[in-house]
Amino acid sequence: MGGAARLSAPQALVLWAALGAAAHIGPAPDPEDWWSYKENLQGNFVPGPPFWGLVNAAWSLCAVGKRQSPVDVELKRVLYDPFLPPLRLSTGGEKLRGTLYNTGRHVSFLPASRPVVNVSGGPLLYSHRLSELRLLFGARDGAGSEHQINHEGFSAEVQLIHFNQELYGNLSAASRGPNGLAILSLFVNVAGSSNPFLSRLLNRDTITRISYKNDAYFLQDLSLELLFPESFGFITYQGSLSTPPCSETVTWILIDRALNITSLQMHSLRLLSQNPPSQIFQSLSGNGRPLQPLAHRALRGNRDPRHPERRCRGPNYRLHVDGGPHGR
């Protein structure tokens, strides 16, 4: 194919019309921020996933990359790796605090500079520092996660985005270099109970503070270890950012036991707007990239697929927090 992505005829027509219209209405959009999950926002064209790699040369991997994310994980393709160590979380024994944002694309929690939260272990050879917690969700139950397991989606997906602090000084630099990023994904179902960490983020007093784009609310005294199941396995593969520039420098770690939130909490998420209050309401839901080909990439897991009936037992299937296995 060469170095450039080839447009289909419909894509070329849409892009030509959109760029022509943009030339006649107001200032040009910021090329580093001109993207969306939906092509049509209030009658204006904004590049959706099929166009990400076509409108900005720096995003070309979105169109031509061979290690893109998200993917559909077929469990029969997962290779059992008994040498994968448990995941380790370091918080320095302190509670997490930070700011919950409605970015117009995601519900995003940005931790404060202190305490520093690090993850290591599993497939990671380096310590990675937490930079963002991102929540993706759908307009209907069972169709909100980016990744799928055996062709089945989940209602939401929580992504913990980390950068390699041993090799890079920040997330931006790490996203451009090898072994730069690690993203832990936890899947979410709608049920009668709720994960205790997500309950802090999604209770009525909190979630109504970020109803519109650019709204923010400060939270503190959060115990990040409560986000994780008491015991779990994980699947890992090499992939990319699932947003522009789609850099192929991510080690993905998918936790194989889903979390729960209530139907009321999910409804509250769907009432969040991707626009400011001065503009028409458009739900934040449906904020995920479509599946990408897995191709010949390896999927590794720490559970033996030959014995799927066996429960995760022992310290290798627990999150190790500040030096020891976490239990509730």
UniProtKB/Swiss-Prot annotation:
Protein name: Carbonic anhydrase-related protein 11
GO MF annotation, one: zinc ion binding
Gene3D superfamilies: Alpha carbonic anhydrase (3.10.200.10)
Residue span of region Disordered: 300-328
Pfam assignment, any one: Carb_anhydrase
Lineage: superkingdom: Eukaryota
Protein localization: Secreted
Family: Belongs to the alpha-carbonic anhydrase family.
InterPro entries: Alpha_CARP_X/XI (IPR041878), CA_dom (IPR001148), CA_dom_sf (IPR036398), Carbonic_anhydrase_a-class (IPR023561)
GO cellular component: basolateral plasma membrane; extracellular region
Sugar-modified residues: 118
Chief location of this protein within or outside the cell: secreted
Residue ranges occupied by any Alpha-carbonic anhydrase domain in the UniProt entry: 33-303
Keyword Glycoprotein part of the UniProt annotation: yes
Biological function: Does not have a catalytic activity.
Keyword Secreted (UniProt): yes
UniProt keyword list: Glycoprotein, Secreted, Signal
Bias (Basic and acidic residues): 319-328
Signal peptide: 1-23
CDD domains: alpha_CARP_X_XI_like
Organism: Mus musculus (Mouse)
